[in-house]
Amino acid sequence: MSQSLIVALDFPGKQDVEQFLRHFEGEELFVKVGMELFYKEGPAIITYLKEKGHKIFLDLKLHDIPNTVKSAMRSLASLDVDMVNVHAAGGSSMMKAAIEGLEEGKQEGKERPICIAVTQLTSTSETMMKKEIGIEKTLEEAVAHYAKLTKESGLDGVVCSTLEVPKLREVCGSEFVTVTPGIRLASDDVNDQVRVATPKRARELGSSYIVVGRSITKAENPLEAYKTVKQQWEGVTV
């Protein structure tokens, strides 16, 4: 299950990435490249990581009119990334357009990237969602609604918190992909995320993938931290 552990490369530039990856010589990781790193380094960072043998979740959370998202996804698919995402709030037409773009842009002989949708960010509390975003549903209801819409639009799954996974399994079935950020070791600070869980708890709740950032990237020994997270995620007793 180690390939379903995604390491968030939340760094400002390639130099920091190179320094971090020195801890992982010989390891083939599944890494997340977000806005900060991609906007700084561009497609070259994807090429660099692919040459190192890593799988890539390109986390740009696209949210625009359908035609723009379709064109953008066509370009992203040509980079040979393994996973991409959109905001479910963009609606069904936009999500369907995203899939069309990925199919058109995928490299010959390869499957299109996994495409998932963001339901609600893990920094969003129910109070914030109601007072600031203007959604009157409960957080669980809003996430379930977006997940159902995502599945109906032909996407593979959603980004959600671990707490929402059991409900989404009921609504969308066991094959629906759930990618869960907000993963922390029990000894770590929560920082700016509200809905968090440990790797062990994520496994128990049924997450398909977990995304782990600071617990690994800010650790004194990143490789040892990675192994600890991996063991908890895979249910290994040491």
Swiss-Prot record:
The active site is at K61 (proton donor). It catalyses: orotidine 5'-phosphate + H(+) = UMP + CO2. GO terms for cellular component: cytosol. Substrate binds at residues 10, 32, 59-68, 122, 184, 193, 213-214. Keywords: Decarboxylase, Lyase, Pyrimidine biosynthesis. One of its GO terms (biological process) is 'de novo' pyrimidine nucleobase biosynthetic process. Pathway: Pyrimidine metabolism; UMP biosynthesis via de novo pathway; UMP from orotate: step 2/2. GO terms for molecular function: orotidine-5'-phosphate decarboxylase activity. SUPFAM superfamilies: Ribulose-phoshate binding barrel (SSF51366). SMART domains: OMPdecase (SM00934). It comes from the Bacteria. Its EC number is 4.1.1.23. Homodimer. Catalyzes the decarboxylation of orotidine 5'-monophosphate (OMP) to uridine 5'-monophosphate (UMP). Belongs to the OMP decarboxylase family. Type 1 subfamily. This is Orotidine 5'-phosphate decarboxylase. It comes from Bacillus cereus (strain AH820). The gene is pyrF.
